[in-house]
């Protein structure tokens, strides 16, 4: 009857459900599943028209196992930095027009305050040193 409730037509159906939280808990008790809590690196937004570049950078970083978040919205850099500090991000990536053209984003370590402009290839290793 569930299909009829949502789709207003009868259709044969079969289903199954598991309690995901219970499954994860059971796996953690058996020490076969560990949740690694990582804080995301934040990519700061300078121009919404560059979203494709931000997403490409995020894809590269996530593919390398780095938790990454693109700043959700359009705000001045100060607000974006406040957001990164609020979520306790270990670092931010400044990837504005000049950085996109040069292919060298600026990585700012939020713990030390140091920042450097580096190639995307080097970015992964530098972030891993920070996190």
Question: What is the meaning of each model-derived region?
Answer:
Residues 1-131:
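TRNA-recognition modules of translation machinery and tRNA-sensing kinases, especially anticodon-binding
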